A protein has these predicted regions:
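Transmembrane helix-bundle segments that form internal channels/tunnels in multi-pass membrane proteins
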Residues: 1-69
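Metallo-beta-lactamase
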Residues: 37-43, 137-187
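Active-site-proximal loop/helix segments of hydrolase catalytic cores
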Residues: 103-107, 125, 129, 133-138, ...
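Conserved beta-strand hairpin/beta-sheet module of binuclear metal-dependent hydrolase folds
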Residues: 63-109, 113, 174-196
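Active-site metal-binding motif and surrounding structural segment of the metallo-beta-lactamase
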Residues: 84-91, 95-149, 206-209
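Short loop/helix-cap segments at secondary-structure boundaries that form the rim of catalytic
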Residues: 6, 60-62, 80-82, 139, ...
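Intrinsically disordered, low-complexity boundary segments flanking structured domains
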Residues: 55-58, 147-153, 202
Length: 209
C-alpha cells in the first residue's frame, strides 16, 4: 500500500488559518481524543472535521469581498488585487531590493497566506529596480500567467484596466511609467508608478473632465 501511494505526487495548499478555524479544529480534535479514551465511536467528529477542512480549503473561492492590498516590500511598490470569488489575482509592480529576495521573503508568503498560489497577471509600471526587481524570482518560484509591461487597455476577470500614460515624450524614465486606472467595487484606483508632479499636473489637465 505504501509503495502504491508513493507513486502519486500531489499536494493541497491552504491559506493562513483563522482563529475560528483553529478553535473548531482543536475542539473536534480534543473531543475525538476524549471519545477514543472512552472507547466510543468518533464518526461524527471525523465527518465534521472533514467538512471544516473542506470549507476552509475552498474559502478563497467563495469569498465575496475581494481586496486591494499594498504589500510591504521595503522599497518601491507592490500592490495585490484579488477579485471576489477568486476570479482574478493580480500584482501591480513587485518591488525589489539588492540584498534581499523580496519575492520569496515577502510577496509569496503573503500570497500563500491569502490562499493564492498563482497570479493571473503582473503589471510592471516601469523598469526601475524597486518596481520590477523581484519579477524574475517571482516567475521562478511562483506561477505567473502573464507579465504586462506596455498596454492601453486590458481586461482580467471582471476588471477593466486602462493605461492613462500620456503621449508626451518625457525625459525621465519615471515620468514614462504606466499610469494604471481601474474601478474595483465602485471605487476608482490610480496606480501612478514614479511619475513626478509635472506629469501629475499634465494628467489632471488631460482627464479633469
Amino acid at each position: 500500500m505504501i509503495d502504491f501511494l508513493t507513486d502519486f505526487s500531489f499536494s493541497l495548499h491552504f491559506s493562513q488559518p483563522t482563529f475560528f478555524f483553529i478553535g473548531v479544529y482543536y475542539y473536534l480534535y480534543l473531543k475525538g481524543i476524549y471519545k477514543i479514551n472512552m472507547q466510543r465511536k468518533i464518526h461524527q467528529e471525523l465527518s465534521l472535521l472533514f467538512a471544516v477542512l473542506l470549507a476552509f480549503y475552498f474559502y478563497p473561492f467563495y469569498n465575496m469581498k475581494g481586496q486591494v492590498v499594498m504589500i510591504d516590500v521595503g522599497q518601491g511598490d507592490c500592490f495585490f488585487i484579488q477579485q471576489p470569488f477568486h476570479k482574478g489575482n493580480i500584482l501591480i509592480d513587485t518591488g525589489g531590493l539588492k540584498n534581499t529576495d523580496v519575492a520569496t521573503k515577502r510577496i509569496i508568503p503573503y500570497l500563500e497566506s491569502q490562499g493564492v498560489f498563482s497570479l493571473d497577471a503582473v503589471f510592471i509600471s516601469h523598469q526601475d529596480f524597486d518596481h520590477c526587481g523581484a519579477l524574475e524570482s517571482l516567475k521562478t518560484h511562483f506561477k505567473v500567467k502573464e507579465v504586462i509591461e506596455s498596454f492601453k487597455e486590458k481586461r482580467i476577470g471582471n476588471l477593466h484596466f486602462k493605461n492613462l500614460a500620456l503621449d508626451k515624450r518625457y525625459v525621465s524614465e519615471n515620468d514614462r511609467s504606466s499610469i494604471i486606472y481601474v474601478t474595483i467595487n465602485h471605487l476608482n484606483y490610480l496606480f501612478t508608478g514614479d511619475i513626478s508632479q509635472e506629469v501629475e499636473k499634465d494628467l489632471y489637465q488631460t482627464y479633469q473632465k
